[in-house]
């Protein structure tokens, strides 16, 4: 079996490159549990689709602006780094586009660089050299790690658009996208309907 067997034709314009406004007007596909039928609805219809006493579990992870452009020293060749996970002691797990060997120094900003520690098929780690914690530097200078299928460059507006209403605990490199469609008005209507809400942190 080839992966290409799962390809199918579709109009790329159907991929939403920007969020629906208002957010809760996004389309929602509903599976009816009794007869297994499908219904096309909208997210703002959730209060009447759920029952009093139901519980919504939402992810309160916050997306870190973890994508940066860098230059290899001394060649100046450009590379892109996505900082995936802080492993402690200034060591980060990363994804790097481009060829890099252990020991390679990548400049990513004034007085900020990453030295490749391990470069493997499934894992790459770097040691960050920075006068301030990298997470703090990324908040100021990093770009939001938009999904590649959006095929557009991130904007300053994405720092707001690509966070959910529940975002509290920084650490994600991708938004829990279902949560992007909730608004304060929708939450108020769910609460009035007697629908509970609890949070988990997954990133």
Q: Where do the PLM segments sit?
A:
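A cross-family signal for N-terminal binding/gating loops and helix N-caps
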Residues: 1-203
């Amino acid at each position: 079996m080839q992966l290409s067997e799962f390809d199918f034709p579709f109009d790329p314009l159907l991929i939403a490159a920007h969020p629906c406004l208002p957010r809760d007007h996004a389309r929602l596909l509903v599976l009816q549990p009794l007869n297994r039928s499908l219904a096309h609805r909208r997210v703002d219809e959730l209060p009447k689709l759920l029952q009093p006493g139901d519980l919504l579990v939402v992810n309160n992870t916050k997306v870190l602006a973890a994508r940066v452009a860098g230059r290899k020293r001394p060649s100046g060749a450009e590379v892109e780094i996505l900082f995936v996970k802080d492993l402690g002691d200034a060591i980060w797990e990363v994804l790097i586009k481009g060829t890099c060997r252990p020991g390679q120094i990548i400049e990513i900003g004034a007085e900020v660089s990453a030295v490749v520690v391990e470069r493997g098929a499934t894992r790459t780690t770097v040691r960050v050299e920075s006068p301030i914690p990298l997470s703090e530097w990324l908040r100021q200078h990093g770009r939001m790690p938009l999904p590649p299928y959006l095929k557009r460059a991130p904007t300053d507006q994405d720092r707001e658009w690509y966070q959910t209403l529940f975002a509290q605990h920084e650490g994600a490199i991708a938004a829990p996208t279902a949560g992007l469609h909730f608004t304060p008005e929708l939450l108020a209507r769910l609460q009035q309907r007697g629908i509970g809400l609890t949070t988990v942190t997954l990133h």
